[in-house]
């Protein structure tokens, strides 16, 4: 495939790795949309690096050779024309003119490619000179900077509180007359439209996963052959302690941009500032020694921490330096939102056109896009924003232009209409009771009509809010003047979501409680300091194509707890631009089945041609005899396992589950990880097992751990879990960890070797079928994909979650583990399991059969280990 058989690799690759790289190379060469599955532990990241970077460098040489060949062909044609029209000067010149123009164009493209190579050489020379101390003013500049910083530190030592960091002047707060053609970009750099060589954008969910990629790249043969640029947020890159102290992302972005504006003031502006009683400063790290930092980034592979450390030494901003490095970078590392969110992508200067996009850990890509573009706003958000807006208009009414007054009035009108949907008025307080408000579901066009905002041009209003930086100015106003007549805090009780969801099902429903918690957690994350940020995001959803989303109106028991939620139903609508512009796209993951989801709901729905889509799936590197999978249909006393909604609180079933765990703990060595369907069910089970004494019996063999509720406690629990296994003293043989499907431990964590000798999945974690959001999603798929798409989505939601849990074990070729699926329904779902699990999967109608199979498996492994 692609005519390539050999790939540079740090060691002899496994056959499946070579196969992966060949298929990846072909995908990029042919400009395809690839879905690649390689089980975790098979060296997927290294295969991606070596396959993709070989293609990247080959393509660069191919591009240059094709330009030279095309130029040579044209020059040959010109010679032939001269011979053909010898003596006829006019005819020869006429034909040659077009060809000469083509030659000039080809030469310009070739020169542009050479120019980048020359720039990298110059960067290397600059880094060398800098490191050797040959830049004349280096010490003087650093000493000058230190003196300046010491003076600033001394002056500000008495005023270090976060709330006093940002010194806003009234001139900063007043809305200016907007130029319709003004450029809203943060950067003033002139981007050359030269021929650019192809870049690879590598995208993953978290910065830790991107750091892992960098670690693998450093071990690869391409460590010194490519320029890599890791992109991150200001939160990760900012080295200005005053800005970082703000913690909140919106506030950090706001203050950073304000400091940039102050550093770009004209002489006229400076005279005005000097007359002001309020002090103003620009960021001391801008522009700084950016050229050297850019050179450092582009000439050596560095992760985020390395770049931050170097930038602190150079006293220059790493955030803006990495952004400026994108132009000459070959491999650009970006988190999900920087690529998948169009506004973020454009603000960073990321251009996907004719470039390659590789998205790793893409198994939840559809859900990630939906979450990224789904927005909730609370009654408290609306009331506080309305309150800030009213105060702001009153404060500056004498200096606001007529246009600005009009737009502010339109925004105020919208906010009043939105709070009306939640049973409030502009004079309401968050803890007031709502009046005449009901739970409702709307299409986008219906919502605007029902909310009575259909007469407002939402596009113009959002453009005004964005270009005028109104949210920043309201935040600045609140910081300086405080919220006079500030809205009262809502009641602590959060019943807005619960009342809505409980009306759908019994009040004691564990699934409903999980759904309530999910919505409450989402809303709690919204920052109240400047609520217009999230309200603007909500208003932007109204620009979505009507059929692609729904809006839920959910009044609370108090107005502040009610919420409006936009749910994106069609993630392809935010991926279509990428599909159209990118040269090739690769979605990679450990468990990508069912691949039909990505084909139907992402690529085809985004307008891709079917023939452009390719798939690749490889087996696990772990030998067949190192994996055992049992579908357990009943327990020790014959009670059938079916953990559906009706049976989940069945005490006989809970007792049987407890007896099963006791028996399995007796025969399985080291670590066991148990995945349960939900947090509420985990609590129910643990309480029941404590009450009937079964938990104590489990504790005789295994030290018991539970998934922590706080993410900050995860590492501590895992460390203790690991220590308990390593230091187990008889009669104990290890530890057992109770976890939750889709929780903090079901993705991204490894339970290799003794940490995960058995993964047990209890029940089938179907999403709550009573959820209105789920119902709307299924209905949308049925109407827009095919008649079975909704029910298939429901089934896939369950099995994808199960497969993620299974993938936590068996992380390298010499590892071994077992998987026990506790529910009789799994017998009919075997084809939805990963291929490497299917090959050893057996259905065990009776408990004794499973016990014997597990006992034989571990006896064989014990014997094998003792013989080594």
What are these regions (language model features)?
Residues 11-28:
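N-terminal pre-P-loop "Q-motif" helix
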Residues 633-652, 705-827:
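Conserved RecA-like P-loop NTPase helicase motor core
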Residues 677-708:
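Conserved helicase motor "Helicase C" RecA-like lobe of SF1/SF2 P-loop NTPases
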Residues 2-11, 56-331, 337-340, 387, ...:
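A substrate-engagement module of RecA-like helicase motors
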Residues 305-329, 340-349, 468-636, 714-745:
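A contiguous, basic/glycine-rich beta-loop/short-helix subdomain that forms a polymer-engagement track
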Residues 576-577, 638-677:
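Conserved interdomain hinge at the start of the Helicase C-terminal
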Residues 30-48, 168, 174, 199:
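Walker A/P-loop
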Residues 352-383:
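SF2 helicase catalytic motif II
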């Amino acid at each position: 495939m692609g005519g390539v058989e050999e790939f540079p690799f740090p060691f002899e690759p496994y056959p499946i790795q070579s196969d992966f790289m060949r298929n990846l190379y072909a995908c990029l060469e042919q400009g395809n949309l690839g879905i690649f599955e390689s089980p975790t532990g098979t060296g997927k990241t290294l295969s991606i690096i070596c396959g993709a970077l070989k293609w990247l460098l080959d393509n660069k040489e191919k591009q240059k050779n094709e330009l030279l060949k095309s130029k040579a062909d044209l020059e040959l044609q010109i010679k032939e024309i001269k011979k053909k029209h010898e003596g006829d000067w006019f005819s020869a010149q006429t034909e040659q003119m077009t060809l000469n123009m083509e030659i000039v164009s080809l030469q310009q493209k070739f020169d542009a490619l050479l120019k980048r190579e020359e720039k990298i050489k110059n960067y290397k020379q600059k880094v060398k000179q800098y490191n050797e101390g040959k830049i004349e003013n280096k010490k003087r500049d650093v000493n000058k900077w230190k003196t300046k910083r010491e003076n600033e530190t001394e002056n500000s030592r008495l005023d270090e509180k976060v709330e006093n960091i940002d010194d806003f002047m009234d001139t900063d707060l007043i809305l200016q007359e907007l130029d319709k053609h003004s450029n809203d970009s943060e950067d003033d750099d002139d981007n050359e439209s030269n021929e650019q060589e192809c870049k690879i954008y590598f995208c993953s969910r978290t910065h830790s996963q991107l750091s892992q990629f960098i670690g693998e790249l450093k071990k690869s043969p391409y460590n010194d052959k490519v320029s890599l640029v890791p992109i991150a947020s200001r939160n990760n890159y900012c080295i200005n302690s005053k800005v970082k102290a703000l913690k909140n992302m919106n506030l950090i972005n706001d203050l950073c941009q304000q400091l940039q504006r102050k550093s770009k003031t004209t002489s006229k502006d400076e005279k005005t500032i000097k007359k002001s009683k309020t002090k103003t400063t620009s960021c001391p790290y801008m522009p700084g020694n950016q050229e050297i930092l850019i050179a450092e980034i582009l000439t050596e592979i560095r992760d985020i921490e390395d770049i931050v450390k170097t930038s602190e030494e150079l006293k220059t901003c790493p955030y803006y330096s990495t952004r400026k490095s994108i132009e000459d970078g070959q491999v650009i590392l970006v988190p999900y939102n920087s690529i998948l969110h169009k506004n973020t992508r454009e603000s960073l200067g990321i251009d996907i056109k004719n470039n390659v996009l590789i998205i790793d850990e893409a198994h939840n890509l559809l859900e990630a896009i939906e979450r990224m573009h789904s927005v909730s706003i609370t009654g408290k958000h609306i009331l506080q924003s309305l309150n800030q807006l009213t105060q702001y208009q009153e404060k500056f009414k004498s200096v606001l232009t007529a246009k600005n007054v009009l737009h502010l009035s339109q925004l105020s009108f919208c906010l009043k209409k939105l709070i009306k949907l939640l049973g409030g008025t502009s004079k309401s307080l968050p803890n007031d009771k709502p009046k005449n408000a009901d739970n409702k579901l709307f299409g986008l066009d219906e919502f605007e009509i029902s909310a009575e905002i259909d007469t407002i041009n939402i596009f113009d209003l959002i453009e005004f809010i964005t270009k005028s930086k109104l949210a920043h100015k309201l935040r600045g106003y609140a910081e300086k003047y405080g919220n006079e007549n500030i809205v009262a805090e809502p009641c602590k009780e959060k019943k807005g979501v619960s009342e809505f969801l409980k009306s759908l099902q019994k009040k004691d429903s564990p699934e409903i409680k999980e759904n309530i918690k999910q919505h409450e957690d989402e809303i709690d994350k919204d920052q109240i300091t400047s609520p217009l940020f999230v309200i603007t995001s909500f208003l932007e959803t109204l620009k979505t194509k009507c059929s692609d989303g729904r809006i839920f109106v959910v009044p609370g028991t108090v107005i502040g707890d009610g919420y409006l939620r936009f749910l994106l139903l069609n993630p392809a609508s935010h991926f279509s631009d990428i599909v159209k512009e990118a040269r090739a796209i690769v979605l990679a993951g450990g468990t990508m089945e069912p691949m039909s989801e990505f084909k139907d709901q992402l690529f085809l729905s985004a307008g891709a041609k079917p023939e452009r889509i390719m798939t690749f799936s490889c087996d696990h590197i772990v030998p067949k005899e190192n994996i055992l999978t049992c579908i357990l249909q009943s327990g020790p006393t014959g009670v059938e396992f079916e953990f559906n909604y009706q049976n989940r609180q069945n005490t006989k079933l809970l007792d049987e589950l407890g007896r099963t765990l006791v028996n399995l703990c007796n025969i399985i060595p080291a670590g066991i990880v148990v995945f349960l369907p939900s947090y509420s069910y985990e609590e129910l089970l643990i309480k029941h097992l404590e009450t009937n004494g079964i938990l104590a019996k489990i504790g005789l063999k295994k030290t018991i751990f539970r998934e922590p509720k706080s993410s900050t406690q995860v590492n501590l629990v895992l460390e203790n879990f690991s220590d308990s296994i390593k230091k187990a003293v008889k009669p104990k043989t290890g530890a057992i960890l109770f976890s939750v499907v889709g929780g903090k431990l079901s993705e991204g964590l490894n339970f290799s070797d003794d940490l995960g000798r058995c993964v047990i999945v209890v029940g089938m974690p179907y999403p709550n079928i009573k959820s209105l959001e789920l119902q709307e999603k299924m209905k949308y798929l049925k109407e827009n994909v095919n008649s079975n798409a909704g029910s298939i989505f429901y089934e896939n939601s369950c099995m994808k979650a199960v497969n993620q849990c299974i993938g936590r074990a068996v992380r390298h070729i010499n590892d071994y583990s077992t998987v026990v699926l506790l529910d009789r329904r799994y017998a009919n779902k075997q084809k939805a399991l990963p291929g490497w699990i299917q090959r050893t999967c057996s259905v065990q109608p009776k408990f004794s059969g499973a016990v014997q199979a597990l006992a034989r498996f571990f006896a064989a492994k014990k014997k094998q280990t003792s013989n080594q």
